[in-house]
Amino acid sequence: MYTSETTAEIIHDLILINNDRIDGYTRALGNLKDGSDQDLRSLFEDYIQQTTQFNHELNPFAVINGEETTEGKPISGKLHRFWLDLKASLSGHDRKSILEECERGEDASKKAYEKAIQESPDLPIHIVSIIRNHAQKQKAAHDHVRNLRDAAL
């Protein structure tokens, strides 16, 4: 059964994984070598901007009893563990290693969105539509990062 608490919990988890995705790509940017990998710099900046937009679209629905749930303790901490691991593991690796870690993070994001979609049958259709739209864009990002990783030397 749909409740505003259910919606806020699902949205909160997505916002957390999105925040970690932003942090992961920010760290990945910092680990790229100066003067090289301009394509990755541009791509990672685009994904940071994309994810910021995702959160902007989700934030209005992350409310329980008039209070935003976007700050504080995660409702489901396991959802964003992979991005946290990514942030810890990036330390000046080469292009392929950075892409491998980014793909691992994208896997975590993909799982979080899949879980949200599975839990969403009772959610309002406009919220489900937003979640599905994000999931499609996130999957495209995942696949692109995977393809770049596979092509890296």
Predicted regions and their residues:
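Short, charged, low-complexity loops and linkers
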Residues: 1-9, 36, 60-66, 88-96
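Small-residue-biased structural context
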Residues: 5, 30, 49, 63, ...
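Alpha-helical scaffold segments that form or flank carboxylate-/histidine-based iron centers
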Residues: 6-16, 36-56, 98-102, 126-137
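Acidic/histidine-rich alpha-helical segments that form the ligand environment
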Residues: 10-32, 80-126, 130
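Residues at alpha-helix boundaries and short interhelical turns
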Residues: 19, 48, 52, 66-69, ...
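Conserved alpha-helical segments that form or flank metal/cofactor-binding pockets of metalloenzymes
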Residues: 38-76, 145-148
